[in-house]
């Protein structure tokens, strides 16, 4: 009987020896504890240069799944754009130059839309500053900024805005048109009611207005509203023609990570909402540029076209005529499909994709169990039918992002119950489970000043195998996972997979 493998990815489950504020250490999780302490386990580096990011940069779900699936270190987004800025090729980018040509021809504006954050997960402020430097020489530039509060401290927007306002003193033709939290402008779970509020602000319509952007943020803070949840507001000092999206304008969506940029991009460029809401009619003759490939969105140009990841783990499995399953809830479905397959939406032979709906709650600390039981129920019905399965549990990451320590404890304890069900099933059916994570989060929920922490970490993640005959090398990175699984399955590793297997005495 040939081997069957389940790769379970616990999103945001990092390892730290610290006790205080560490939901991973302090939750009652007997099954996970047993796996890490009593089965073959190695810690993997999931941040910085180990995953193709700048040194010291926190890992994230997109990069984590890319590296796991690719079997090589993948340089994307942040590192790629940083290098283009450093060597100045950024300022000669064809997509940007075409945008300038378009707005000069049409005497129109350029809108820079995206997450205003130094987190480096979806975007980076240095990229925005470079765009301002480039475009302000040629046209009026309008900024539409989404507050973060998840990948950085919950109330860091004010400080970043203060720095931006100083920077903008040298660029008088650049204005801040709108400000709002990513909760509204960067949804990825089809919550169109939220996204529509942010979109209408881009069109010049909002119940909230500001004369001073920093003053508006301060008022939000006074009302206990952190950066992520700031209600979209428009600049009261400008008429709508001066800042709102209009016909013939140029648009740059400067997020390099696609998953939370797709819905807003759809509203701007592809929306058919105007069929029953005429005021939302898509603007004509927009020149719309996305920093990277936003799957499902066809812009005028990509600033940085997608690189091809040839012979990913899923592709190798398919080429060997093996059946594979991908399963996750909505929040992480793109990660076990699009990102795991190298940043492309592909349909492989003998592949089944199963999407479990995420719960419709405002924030996941209100339902910390999320959809882990429903995922497990569906998984155990199907698992025996597949040679290779990729599973993602979102709880540690999504509840970790709320900064609610007690909710994260509950999330991990609910998850542990489902992990035990899976382990028991795998043992009974001769299926080997490899368990890992894409980055850390839940292991640092409170800082030394007793403040909640909502962002990812640079801590390592576990890589566990339920086959006790396995011996791992002592250290590794996420890219080692795919070669390890291929060797375990007795499948040849393609030359494109430059990382090595972690199985001892083998390459």
Swiss-Prot record:
Q: How is the cofactor bound?
A: Binds 2 manganese ions per subunit.
Q: What is its EC number?
A: 5.4.2.12
Q: Which residues form the active site?
A: 61 (phosphoserine intermediate)
**Which reactions fall under this protein's catalytic activity?**
(2R)-2-phosphoglycerate = (2R)-3-phosphoglycerate
State the UniProt keywords alphabetically. Glycolysis, Isomerase, Manganese, Metal-binding
Among the GO molecular function terms of this UniProt record, one is: manganese ion binding
- Result of knocking out the encoding gene: Probably essential, it was not disrupted in a global transposon mutagenesis study.
Q: Which CDD domains match?
A: iPGM
Q: Which Pfam families does the entry link to? A: iPGM_N (PF06415), Metalloenzyme (PF01676)
Which BP terms from GO are recorded? carbohydrate metabolic process; glucose catabolic process; glycolytic process
Which pathway does the protein contribute to? Answer: Carbohydrate degradation; glycolysis; pyruvate from D-glyceraldehyde 3-phosphate: step 3/5
Residues where Mn(2+) 1 binds: 397, 401, 456
Supply the enzyme class, top level.
isomerase
Matching entries from InterPro entries are given as: Alkaline_phosphatase_core_sf, BPG-indep_PGM_N, Metalloenzyme, PGAM_B_sf, Pgm_bpd_ind
Record keyword Nucleus present: no
For substrate, which residues are the binding ones?
A: 122, 150-151, 182, 188, 257-260, 332
Required cofactor names = Mn(2+)
State the Gene3D superfamilies in the record. Answer: Alkaline Phosphatase, subunit A (3.40.720.10), BPG-independent phosphoglycerate mutase, domain B (3.40.1450.10)
> Which cellular component, as a GO term, is one annotated location?
cytosol
Binding residue positions for Mn(2+) 2: 11, 61, 438-439
Q: Which family does it belong to?
A: Belongs to the BPG-independent phosphoglycerate mutase family.
Mind telling me which NCBIfam families this protein's record contains?
Answer: pgm_bpd_ind
Q: What does this protein do?
A: Catalyzes the interconversion of 2-phosphoglycerate and 3-phosphoglycerate.
Q: Fill in the subunit field for this protein.
A: Monomer.
Question: What protein name applies here?
Answer: 2,3-bisphosphoglycerate-independent phosphoglycerate mutase
Which species expresses this protein natively?
Mycoplasma genitalium (strain ATCC 33530 / DSM 19775 / NCTC 10195 / G37) (Mycoplasmoides genitalium)
């Amino acid at each position: 009987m040939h081997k069957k493998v389940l790769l379970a990815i616990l999103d945001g489950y990092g390892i730290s020896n610290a006790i205080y504020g560490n939901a991973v250490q302090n939750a009652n999780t007997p099954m996970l504890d047993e796996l890490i302490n009593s089965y073959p386990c190695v810690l993997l580096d999931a941040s910085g240069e180990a995953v193709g990011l700048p040194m010291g940069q926190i890992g994230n779900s997109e990069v984590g799944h890319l590296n796991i699936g690719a079997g090589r270190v993948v340089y994307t987004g942040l590192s790629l754009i940083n290098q283009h800025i450093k060597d100045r090729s950024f300022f000669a980018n064809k997509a940007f130059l075409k945008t300038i040509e378009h707005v000069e021809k049409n005497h129109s504006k350029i809108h820079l839309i995206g997450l205003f954050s130094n987190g480096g997960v979806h975007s980076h402020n240095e990229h925005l500053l470079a765009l301002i430097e480039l475009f302000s020489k040629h046209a009026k530039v309008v900024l539409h900024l989404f507050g973060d509060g998840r990948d950085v401290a919950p109330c860091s927007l004010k400080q970043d805005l203060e720095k931006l306002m100083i920077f903008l003193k040298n660029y008088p033709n650049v204005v801040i048109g709108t400000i709002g939290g990513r909760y509204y402008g960067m949804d990825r779970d089809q919550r169109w009611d939220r996204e529509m509020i942010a979109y209408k602000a881009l069109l010049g319509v909002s119940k909230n207005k500001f004369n001073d952007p920093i003053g508006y943020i301060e008022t939000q803070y006074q009302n206990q509203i952190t950066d992520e949840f700031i209600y979209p507001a428009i600049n009261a000092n400008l008429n709508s023609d001066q800042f709102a999206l209009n016909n013939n304008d140029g648009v740059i969506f400067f997020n390099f990570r696609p998953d939370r940029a797709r819905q807003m991009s759809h509203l701007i460029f592809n929306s058919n909402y105007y069929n029953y809401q005429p005021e939302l009619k898509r603007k004509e003759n927009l020149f719309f540029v996305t920093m990277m490939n936003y799957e499902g969105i066809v812009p005028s140009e990509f600033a940085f076209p997608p690189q091809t990841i040839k012979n990913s783990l899923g592709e190798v499995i398919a080429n060997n005529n093996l059946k594979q399953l991908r399963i996750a809830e909505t929040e992480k479905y793109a990660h076990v499909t699009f990102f795991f397959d190298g940043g492309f939406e592909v349909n492989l032979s003998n592949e089944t994709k199963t999407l479990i709906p995420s719960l419709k709650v405002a924030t996941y600390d209100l339902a910390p169990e999320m959809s882990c039981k429903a995922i497990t129920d569906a998984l155990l019905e199907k698992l025996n039918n597949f040679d290779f399965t990729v599973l993602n549990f979102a709880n540690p990451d999504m509840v970790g992002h709320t900064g609610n320590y007690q909710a994260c404890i509950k999330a991990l304890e609910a998850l542990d119950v489902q992990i035990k069900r899976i382990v028991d099933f795998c043992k009974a059916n001769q299926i080997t489970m490899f368990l890992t994570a894409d980055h850390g989060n839940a292991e640092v929920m409170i800082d030394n000043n007793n403040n909640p922490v909502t962002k990812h970490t640079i801590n390592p993640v576990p890589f566990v195998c339920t086959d006790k005959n396995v011996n791992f090398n002592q250290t590794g990175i996420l890219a080692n996972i795919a070669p390890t699984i291929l060797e375990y399955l007795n499948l040849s590793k393609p030359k494109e997979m430059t990382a090595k297997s972690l199985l001892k005495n083998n390459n």
